[in-house]
Amino acid sequence: RCGVCEKVCPTGAIRFDQEDRIISENVGAIVVTTGFNVLNTDFFPEYGYGKYKDIITGIQFERLASASGPTLGEIRRPSDGKIPQKIVFVACAGSRDPAKGIPYCSKICCMYTAKHAMLYQHKVHNGESYVFYMDIRAGGKNYEEFVRRAIEEDGVNYIRGRVARIYEKNGKLIVKGVDTLLGASPVEIEADMVVLATAGVANKGAEDLAQK
């Protein structure tokens, strides 16, 4: 190491000769950031993840959209490398589902799904994107405006309702759900790709750590 950063640091925060020491402080509370995991996709077999190659998770879509990802930022289907002309995003994939033991909202899914849908529209200009959601929970500064931008400026189609089943037919993914804003009317979309916004769950060991 050259040590230049230590010399030029205006606050003296860099010290290469500093030794380990134990510090004791009296505090009012301790916040431990344990992180989280995403829900195992085997949790909802009705969505067909693992059975159909073109059903992926939000994390996998993030890699596809990244310039350093496997497709160099191009949105392409895992099955054949073609650009999907119609894509469905399923928010709350596992979240807010008391029947399966996850009654809570994962909080992050609404926003990263909106971002993913916008990225898709920016990269596939003639493509169609649909988002199935339960409620829009945009809990942050300018978050609501961000979602409205996805809808009004980028043309993302939002459908308020749950997806009941996804299956493949004649090379297309059939997404069956309902639109609760239209009186729970059945909705069926033929998609080229489906992205699941899987629920966030507590990190392994977090409960044990809380007892210590």
Predicted region positions:
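Residues forming the flavin
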Residues: 1-212
